[in-house]
Amino acid sequence: MRPNVLLVVLDTARADAFEPYGALAGTTPTVAQMASASNGFVHRAMYSTACWTLPAHASLFTGRLPRSAGFAKGTPPVFKHAMDAYPVDTLPDALRRAGYDTAGLSANPWISEATGFDRGFERFQMLETDRNKEMDGKRRRDRAAWLLDALRARADDGAVAIEHLLAEWLRARTKQPFFWFVNLMECHSPYLPPKPYSPAGPIGRVRAARDAARHCTLDALWRVGAGGWDIDDGALQRMRAMYDGAIRQLDAWLARVFEHLDEAHVLEDTVVIVTSDHGENFGEDHKFGHTFSLDDRLLHVPFITRGPVSIDLHAVASLADVPGALARTLGVPSGAFDDVDAPRGVAVAQLDAVGDEGDERVDAAVERWGLPESAKKFFFTSYACATDGAIKLVRRRGYEEVFVLATDPLEQAPIRMDETVDARFADELAPLRRALDAAAASEAAPIDDDADDADHDGDAGAAEVSALEKQMRLLGYL
């Protein structure tokens, strides 16, 4: 019988927050034990295909780069339309056809029925988090609610509820193999882990919550991305400390899930995959959050597995490689993932413009922030990058630049392309250029934003959209 699969996405978790990728010993003991187990594996050069949740998950489920299937940009209804209209099997589709029990649990409002990511799952549930439940009425619309939560230090972002559901499913399961997907939001802003994982007392937590309330709104993140840096070192340190506490919380969660698998006598028959959709910046090169950048703090994600089979991936891989590799490993028909645009041995990522030139919203925002006209380029520029883990090639607006990651890990010293540079890096650049050319050639027409108003069969209902909006407010997006 085929093995079970538990795919856990730790939203916003950067690779270097975990011991196998350089974090201090004792930071993530469960992940460290996964990596060192006789049936464990660490992929040291796994990259996301985007710097934010929706396109990254689209790649993880379809095996394609975001633009290739129309997942480049758009609102939740646009993504739902793209997922519903996707012409071949997604990973959950393929595993369901192969006889797997497919189920998903998400604490992330972006990964929900409202955005189409329930496709292929027999059961899918987006959970209302403890933090959401504790903040009712007007408070739910006010980021001051984060201050209240900071004092209480008891609410989580859905991990406990998801753990309980997994335990229930394990008790009720049949002999049918399962593919269960989980998305956890503990280390996403506002970075407020509950006791005992919080590194600060009540006063420190309130200060960290105030920092998040100021700097984690969409308006603030875009302002910083456009060059309006205004975050002091103390705020960065407080938020990073809370983020690291959330990482420890997730590591402890994984330990309990392993216990549940063991108690259900399926641990040795289950492939557990721990990864992320993207990372997070905390002031490196004056970057914060996960906007307007394809730097390695955002793209380099953890990928650790433990189980009876090993997933065959190239030494350098991206989330778009995972569906095909997993399907082949499980002996599941993988035709939907074999003839894809994602290059092998090179990781490509894409970032799309927020708006088009002349967008009045962008004009008003740049004027409100007091930034120069040149700041608008951050909103209007789409670009892509390719890396072999040592060299990163960035292509934007008709020009290329190179980063040598060994000597420039923060990517602060771009090397503009000329004949000398081209000759110096000729061997390294050739496969990266081929990858970017192939990705560009495979781009699908983007879904029109008018899809927001279209009457698509199976569109999420008012309840799902309301739940999405409610949780997005708590994350600072609205």
Model-derived features with residue positions:
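Catalytic domains that recognize anionic headgroups
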Residues: 1-478
